[in-house]
Amino acid sequence: MKLEKLPEEFVQAQPVLEKISEHGFEAYFVGGSVRDVLLGREIHDVDIATSAYPEEIKDIFPYTIDVGIEHGTVLVLAGKSEAEHYEITTFRTESKYTDYRRPDHVDFVRDLREDLKRRDFTVNAFACDFEGQIIDLFDGLTDLKERRLTAVGSALERFNEDALRIMRAMRFASTLDFKIEEKTFSAMRERSHLLEKISVERIFIELDKLLLGSEWRNGLTLLIESEAWKYLPDFQDLALKKVLTELSVDFHFKNSEQAWAALLTRFSNIDVKAFLRKWKVSNEFSKYVADLVSAYELENWDLVSLYHFGLEKALLVDELKIAFGRDIDRERAVFINDQLQIHDKSEIVIAGKDLMDEFSLKPGPELGKILKTIEEKIVKNELKNEQIAILTEVKKMLELEK
């Protein structure tokens, strides 16, 4: 099969492949970029594989950087822009995977087949030369046509080599709307316990992409049916089933925070921040998700809660409430937000220093208490956010304390 037209990303990289070819070596576009071209999807990364060894690539191109030379990868700087920087990796075979994630060592080879047969799934094992000729050694085109995910060679071996491939399969089911071939799924289920060997950070990335996929329901269903959920920190299959059955069928998550919050609203006896600490996410992400889960429990928005959580989070929460079938006033959050004089305490027209100068106050608990009270009154519209009004109010507060 030959592509009728190369995508712009391949056209831009064409001279690199041609130059390698001129020196007597093979070079191909490989991996997900070729798959995405065949699916008519946007390309994110252009991966190039070659029969040339790393030192030979460095002899061909004047500007290179060793980014993973021990694994055969050299970054070729073909132009000034980052878009013209290409990672070029030598065809290779791999030894056993002691850690179930990375090979203990790699051997460079000249044979394309040897390189492609170590890849995870047939639809990721294509090669494409600089003229657009597709090389399909494992019947990936048939799988692509059938939207089917099949492991290259022995599925058990592929998942033994890299257990993260189990999560990748589920992610592809979600993002590409692929079904899993029977033997491949059976191997996923049989090897799901190996996910305990994989870092939670890597699993989180795959699970997060799964949740944001157009067919996230497929991915979550596979997570349950493969029993892989058992090997994810503090996961509950009942919560996953509730999300699948209780969330409206056409709902798609706006962002990662909303997706994880949706899951966690269905968990029982959950400490959100403690749960997310086990997933080693950032404090910022953890706080955002915890806020969404807390806000989900509110019956209605008022000035104080809207100010505390902010309109962005309020709208994300309202989307979840509606998707889970709760009857809410869809316009209330925006209406309440419009009634707020401030949306952050930095918008208060007077700062602590102003009060210190005006009333000879010193830094400390008393000043902090006054500032907090002023903020609360402005939020509740009990006090105008105006300098004279605030100074008058503070004066009253100080006189009452005498």
Swiss-Prot record:
Its cofactor is Mg(2+). One of its GO terms (molecular function) is tRNA binding. ATP binds at G32, R35, R119, D162, R165, R168, R171. Its EC number is 2.7.7.72. Keywords: ATP-binding, Magnesium, Metal-binding, Nucleotide-binding, Nucleotidyltransferase, RNA repair, RNA-binding, Transferase, tRNA processing. Mg(2+) binds at D45, D47. It is an enzyme of class 2 (transferase). GO terms for biological process: RNA repair; tRNA 3'-terminal CCA addition. It catalyses: a tRNA precursor + 2 CTP + ATP = a tRNA with a 3' CCA end + 3 diphosphate; a tRNA with a 3' CCA end + 2 CTP + ATP = a tRNA with a 3' CCACCA end + 3 diphosphate. CDD domains: NT_ClassII-CCAase (cd05398). CTP binds at G32, R35, R119, D162, R165, R168, R171. A single active site specifically recognizes both ATP and CTP and is responsible for their addition. HAMAP family: CCA_bact_type3. Catalyzes the addition and repair of the essential 3'-terminal CCA sequence in tRNAs without using a nucleic acid template. Adds these three nucleotides in the order of C, C, and A to the tRNA nucleotide-73, using CTP and ATP as substrates and producing inorganic pyrophosphate. tRNA 3'-terminal CCA addition is required both for tRNA processing and repair. Also involved in tRNA surveillance by mediating tandem CCA addition to generate a CCACCA at the 3' terminus of unstable tRNAs. While stable tRNAs receive only 3'-terminal CCA, unstable tRNAs are marked with CCACCA and rapidly degraded. Homodimer. Belongs to the tRNA nucleotidyltransferase/poly(A) polymerase family. Bacterial CCA-adding enzyme type 3 subfamily. This is CCA-adding enzyme. The gene is cca.
